[in-house]
Amino acid sequence: MRDKVNINTVDISQLEVFFQPAKKPAKQTIVFAHGFSVHHSYFKSFSETLVDYDYYAPLWPGHNHHGFTDKELSPIHYAHLLVAWIEKQDLENIVLIGHSMGGAVASYALQFLKPQRVEKLVLLAPLSYSNLLNYYKIKKAFKKKDEKLSYFKRMFQPKFPDLQNDGQWQMELDKHTAMCKKLTFQIFKELSRLNSAYKTITIPAFLLLAQHDDFMPTKATLNYFNRFLIKKGNLQSGVILHSQHQMFNSKHESFCKAMHDILKHNKLSKIY
């Protein structure tokens, strides 16, 4: 079901958007929707290879430098921001890529965008009902305090370049953890609507999964999307072997090959 929202009234003044211009005459535009509890720079290993594309990566409320309200912590709200920003920029011929929670954001956004805006959708280990199967694995991820802090420092160094010691980092981590709990609640609350959003996708869609993903159960997600969600004529799906949730980092070369096939040839092999 579509939200009754006027995209023209959505305030995008606080939305941070990273831009990397094409080094060659741009043939297409890529817009990347990042996932849960990350900074857009975690996709840098791949985005730096996109010399033929203008590349944009928004940072959602709760993940960027600005403050936020609880009602802004929602994949649907992130989608509203994304749509309003794309419409304002008047972008067309877009390849829309969503990783993890970003897959939900991208799919919600398609419900509001004008048809000519997006040429194809790429879903990288996307959020879905299948996540419920791995709920306890997700909950236990980075369970130890030192592991949480170490991961947070690596991920959000671009956001907090001036923090001097672990005490300062821990304060930011505590605030971030509180934000994540609220966002998690909203994500689960919206899952049924996400299911409906996936079913409305009519443009070419590419589903790329990681073989050893601790967050998205690979086989269940593959079957779920192919059997119940996106129509078979619109969806191509593949799996990157020996890879983890952030497949673009864990198996970089295989991921780049898969993305090359998608971007240049509109195809996706079953295995990479």
From Swiss-Prot:
Superkingdom of the source species: Bacteria
Keywords recorded for this protein, A-Z: Hydrolase, Serine esterase
GO MF entries: carboxylic ester hydrolase activity
Active site, renumbered: H34, S100 (charge relay system)
Disulfide-linked positions: none
Pfam families with a match to the protein in the record: Abhydrolase_6
Entry GO terms, CC: membrane
Entry's EC annotation: 3.1.-.-
Family, per entry: Belongs to the lipase/esterase LIP3/BchO family.
PANTHER family registered for this protein in UniProt: HYDROLASE, PUTATIVE (AFU_ORTHOLOGUE AFUA_2G14860)-RELATED, MONOACYLGLYCEROL LIPASE
Protein name: Putative esterase/lipase 3
